[in-house]
């Protein structure tokens, strides 16, 4: 690893336990619904499968039974150690960065990458496709809203726009692909005190108390409705005679 990759590895090693806790707390059946869709489309089952930037193996429990040889690659050794506890005997773990893995020229029937922070330019999608013999699957969160906090938050996550950039690039390159969106909803109870403490540094006291009153009224608890949307881009990578 070069210095930059080593720094990234150390960052994700330190964040691994917290990252896994966040994944475990998620109420959404994302991995199960994605697996069912891939079965429906005939992408699963498959022989060889690469889960690149696979982290702690969020998709592993749902995907591994559909795959003969499952390779989970990540730059973080600690992430891989956590993922190993979820693995069956058909899973191989690879401690390697995305760039180094692409350089190896290895081939997999299906290449899958979910919420990959290293896939930060559309051109890298093309590079990822070089690893695939049949399908390259890119999966990301594209929208996240809730009823209590989102209306007042101005900053947006730039990564939510990455999928639109990937699609624009693929269209420009005249590469075929199809997409599928997955919608999920959940609700959680938020206390008046939590809402107040969340915004106390953003708003003056009069504005804060006015909004607390408008939202909660005489109630101490309010239900916060969450809506998230994930999107899949599926890129066929089979070579045709004209490609040779």
Regions found by a protein language model. Name each.
Residues 1-42:
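Conserved class I S-adenosyl-L-methionine
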Residues 50, 55-100:
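Class I SAM-dependent methyltransferase SAM/SAH-binding core
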Residues 100-106:
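Short conserved loop adjoining the S-adenosyl-L-methionine
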Residues 112:
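A conserved beta-strand element that flanks and buttresses the S-adenosyl-L-methionine
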Residues 118-131:
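A short, conserved alpha-helix within the catalytic core of class I
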Residues 133-146:
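Conserved beta-strand signature within the Rossmann-like core of class I S-adenosyl-L-methionine
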Residues 158-178:
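Short alpha-helix
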Residues 178-244:
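Conserved Class I S-adenosyl-L-methionine
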């Amino acid at each position: 690893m070069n210095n930059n990759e080593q720094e990234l590895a150390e960052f994700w090693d330190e964040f691994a336990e917290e990252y896994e806790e966040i994944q475990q707390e998620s109420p959404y059946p994302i991995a199960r619904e994605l697996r069912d869709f891939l079965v429906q489309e005939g992408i699963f089952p498959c022989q060889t499968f690469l889960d690149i930037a696979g982290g702690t193996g969020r998709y592993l429990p749902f995907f591994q039974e559909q795959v003969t040889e499952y390779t989970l690659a990540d730059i973080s050794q600690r992430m891989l150690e956590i993922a190993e506890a979820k693995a069956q005997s058909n899973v191989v773990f690879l401690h390697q960065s995305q760039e180094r893995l692409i350089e190896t020229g290895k081939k997999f029937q299906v290449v899958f990458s979910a919420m990959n922070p290293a896939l930060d330019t559309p051109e890298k999608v093309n590079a990822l496709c070089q690893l695939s013999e049949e399908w390259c699957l890119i999966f990301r969160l594209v929208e996240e809203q809730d009823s209590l906090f989102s209306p007042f938050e101005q900053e947006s996550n730039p990564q939510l726009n990455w999928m639109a950039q990937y699609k624009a690039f693929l269209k420009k390159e005249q590469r075929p692909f199809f997409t599928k969106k997955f919608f999920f909803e959940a609700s959680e109870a938020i206390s008046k005190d939590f809402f107040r403490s969340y915004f106390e540094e953003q708003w003056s006291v009069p504005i804060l108390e006015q909004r607390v009153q408008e939202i909660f009224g005489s109630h101490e608890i309010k239900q916060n409705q969450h809506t998230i949307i994930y999107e899949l881009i599926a890129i066929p990578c089979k070579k045709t005679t004209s490609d040779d």
